């Protein structure tokens, strides 16, 4: 490869290239969000607040109405207080033209908090450098968004997405703050505790998937902090850190307890039937956990993670962890991951909404990433150590060279196995050893003695090389033979150094991963008859950005926006005497912003929600 070109391939340049590509990929997602409109429960939960706004045009009155309705819902239907409060503030109540604020908030929250979480975790826990951590965070966020199963539920339908995607994103933000809190100073810990406690309390009052998962993580974090501070006397985690983790965990559990204690929960449970039972819930939980991971690991995603192995290996080796229990960690984290589905399986059986599936799929990327890093770290530790022992016939670097009275300095040994300098091992030019005397004193000695370059001198006291490894020299002053040097140079250099990809190669692997992912996505695209265009062909299984771009280019998004805007203006213009109204059906249903619409059946529950919103008896399509 051209050297001038190679010099330009730096971690900084690759980071900015991937960042620019990511920004370009999300531009269509924001643009098509300008054409989004309310759907289904947006109308139901906005019925009271839109009426208050139309009568008063007071934002404070709308907020008060939302709070009052939250209390009412808490008593008669469900206890997710923080989510219910936000649901009634959907932007469309202030005017249909303001609904674009919903996807703007939802997309920005997921993108920002997801990247921030991955960046913080990789940098603070695994000691990855800033550019690499940020680049990996961008790539993982990009892939999770492009392969989203039902993007309308996650980013463009306010009611469903604020309930699940937004609070899942807030949970990622909370976890990032908790990671940073571990090494924060006292003043910083106070600020982080305040922000984290409020976030944890609000998440506790949101959907039960995120609330339960968060409480388990926070309880484990608080317990770990107590263990390290009180029992281990850890100097990094201070007593004020321990207190902070306990406070945040208490806030989270308080929010969840208030939500679970709502009288409305029992009434709602009666409407859907009895609970599933513990045994069935347990089976459903783990069965769906396995299914969801298999669902996420489709061809594009699988290719992406395979191509990311060099990157994850570099991150794993940089951290310095021992990675001793890969199987235990995999089972434990899988159990945590599966807990997200437990509440809905217990309450409703297998009836899980797509918007909830989406956040479980998002969480799968976190699970796969950190387990893959841990497993690669275990592979590196296990097989590097084993190969060293086979090469040197012992367990220490000093025994490797047969220098029973000498010991390599760590830096020098790194140079010895690092590549080009290994070829100089025979002559020992510039290598230092630390010589230990009987009295325990030590001093550095440079070996430039001509005897070390003398082949006869070396061969005279050469050590034996067998298929199982290198035996120790009979005399402590003996140096390695030419053949031993070749083994060190060829095996260690070619094997380990190829696995231990340089920072440049790791970042190149990121770019290759994205290219392979895009190619795999293209291969998964289907062409067939659409659901709403009789006899007309369309594309299916498009990545999110491609689907949004196609809807913008072919005009479907614009047509959809015009038709729903005209419908809204017509319904607002009708008099109170007109209680039975028909409207034209939609001609376009553009992905990814279309969620659902009213039907030609006057008794359809979709129609009932829209009728309540516009204060009509019944609305249906022609």
Stretches with model-predicted labels:
Residues 1-8, 124-125, 179-194, 223-239, ...:
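Membrane-interface junctions at the ends of membrane-embedded or membrane-associated helices
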Residues 6, 10-77, 91-133, 506-622:
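Intrinsically disordered, polar/acidic, low-complexity terminal segments
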Residues 28-105, 158-161, 208-364:
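Transmembrane catalytic cores of multi-pass membrane glycosyltransferases
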Residues 110-122, 170-182, 215-223, 305-309, ...:
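Transmembrane alpha-helical segments
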Residues 130-182, 207, 298, 338-373:
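Membrane-interface micro-motifs in multi-pass membrane enzymes
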Residues 141-147, 200-205, 251-260, 333-344, ...:
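Aromatic-anchored segments of alpha-helical transmembrane domains
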Residues 190-217:
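Membrane-interface alpha helices of multi-pass inner-membrane proteins
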Residues 330, 376-399, 404, 411-424, ...:
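Signature aromatic-anchored transmembrane alpha helix within multi-pass, membrane-resident enzymes
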């Amino acid at each position: 490869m051209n050297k001038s070109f190679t010099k330009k391939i730096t971690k900084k340049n690759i980071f900015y290239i991937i960042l620019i590509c990511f920004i370009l990929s999300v531009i269509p997602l924001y643009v098509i969000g300008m054409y989004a409109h309310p759907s289904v429960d947006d109308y139901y939960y906005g019925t009271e607040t839109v009426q208050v706004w139309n009568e008063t045009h007071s934002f404070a009155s709308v907020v008060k109405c939302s709070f009052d309705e939250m209390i009412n819902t808490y008593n008669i239907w469900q206890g997710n207080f923080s989510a219910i409060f936000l649901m009634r503030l959907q932007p469309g109540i202030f005017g249909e033209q303001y609904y674009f604020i919903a996807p703007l908030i939802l997309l920005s929250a997921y993108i920002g908090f997801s990247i921030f979480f991955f960046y913080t975790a990789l940098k603070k826990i695994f000691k990855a450098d800033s550019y690499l951590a940020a680049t990996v965070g961008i790539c993982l966020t990009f892939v999770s968004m492009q392969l989203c199963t039902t993007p309308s539920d996650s980013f463009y339908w306010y009611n469903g997405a604020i309930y699940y995607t937004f609070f899942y994103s807030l949970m990622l933000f909370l976890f990032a703050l908790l990671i940073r809190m571990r090494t924060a100073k006292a003043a910083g810990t106070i600020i982080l505790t305040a922000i984290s406690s409020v976030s944890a309390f609000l998440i506790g009052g949101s959907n039960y998937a995120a609330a339960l998962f968060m409480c388990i993580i926070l309880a484990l974090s608080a317990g770990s902090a107590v263990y390290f501070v009180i029992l281990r006397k850890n100097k990094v985690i201070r007593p004020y850190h321990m207190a902070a983790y306990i406070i945040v965990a208490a806030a989270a559990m308080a929010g969840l307890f208030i939500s679970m204690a709502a009288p409305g929960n029992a009434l709602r449970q009666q409407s859907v039937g009895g609970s599933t039972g513990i045994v069935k819930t347990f089976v459903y939980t783990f069965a769906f956990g396995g299914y969801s991971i298999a669902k996420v690991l489709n061809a594009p995603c699988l290719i992406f993670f395979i191509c990311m192995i060099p990157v994850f290996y570099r991150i794993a080796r940089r951290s310095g962890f021992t990675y001793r229990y890969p199987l235990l960690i995999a089972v434990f984290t899988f159990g945590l991951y599966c807990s997200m589905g437990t509440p809905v399986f217990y309450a409703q059986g297998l009836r899980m909404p797509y918007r909830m599936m989406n956040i479980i799929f998002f969480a799968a990327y976190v699970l796969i990433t950190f387990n893959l890093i841990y497993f690669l770290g275990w592979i590196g530790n296990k097989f590097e150590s084993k190969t060293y022992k086979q090469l040197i016939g012992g367990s220490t670097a000093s025994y490797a060279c047969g220098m029973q009275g000498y010991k390599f300095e760590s830096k020098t040994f790194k140079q010895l196995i690092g590549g080009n300098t290994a070829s100089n091992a025979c002559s020992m030019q510039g290598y230092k050893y630390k010589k230990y005397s009987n009295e325990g004193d030590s001093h550095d000695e440079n070996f430039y003695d001509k005897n070390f370059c003398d082949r006869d001198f070396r061969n005279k006291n050469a050590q034996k090389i067998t298929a199982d490894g290198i035996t120790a020299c009979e005399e402590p002053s003996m140096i390695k033979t030419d053949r031993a040097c070749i083994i060190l140079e060829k095996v260690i250099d070619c094997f380990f150094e190829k696995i231990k990809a340089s920072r440049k190669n790791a970042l190149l692997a990121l770019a290759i991963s994205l290219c392979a992912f895009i190619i795999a996505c293209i291969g998964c695209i289907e062409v067939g008859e659409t659901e709403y265009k009789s006899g007309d062909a369309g594309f299916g299984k498009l990545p999110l950005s491609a689907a949004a771009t196609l809807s913008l280019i072919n005009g479907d998004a614009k047509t959809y926006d015009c038709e729903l805007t005209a419908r809204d203006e017509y319904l607002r213009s009708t008099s109170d005497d007109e209680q039975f109204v028909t409207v034209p059906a939609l001609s376009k249903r553009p992905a990814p912003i279309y969620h659902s619409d009213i039907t030609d059946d006057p008794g359809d529950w979709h129609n009932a929600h829209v009728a309540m919103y516009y204060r009509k008896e019944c609305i249906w399509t022609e």
